[in-house]
């Protein structure tokens, strides 16, 4: 499988709050991993939220020894969200920050997606 990823801030916004991760090789026990996050426009630290959420999800998936893709992804999302919420509460400059998140992995002829 070959993959390609690109992101662009567009012509209106100065800052691109999008972030992505794309790996067509194994990440932990998943054979591949694709993630897109879009920091909430207009909210504080949206760029930080999208980047760090993806970095935490990738780290969690990499360390997870499980073999059930849904559980691996769900656990990674929950851990990343807990950290993001805590940071938002502890640091006023990040108060209210957030991001959307879409994760996919292809195993055999099945696509697993979390949104």
Located regions from the model:
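PP2C/PPM-type serine/threonine phosphatase catalytic domain
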Residues: 1-115
């Amino acid at each position: 499988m070959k993959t390609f990823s690109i992101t662009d801030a567009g012509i209106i916004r100065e800052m691109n709050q999008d972030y992505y991760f794309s790996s067509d090789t194994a990440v932990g026990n998943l054979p591949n991993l694709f993630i897109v996050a879009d920091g909430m426009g207009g909210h504080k630290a949206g760029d930080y939220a999208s980047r760090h959420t993806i970095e935490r999800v990738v780290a969690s998936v990499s360390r997870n020894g499980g073999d059930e893709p849904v559980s691996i992804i769900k656990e990674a999302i929950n851990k990343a969200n807990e950290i993001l919420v805590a940071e938002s509460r502890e640091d006023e400059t990040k108060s209210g920050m957030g991001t959307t998140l879409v994760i996919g992995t292809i195993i055999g002829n099945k696509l697993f997606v979390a949104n």
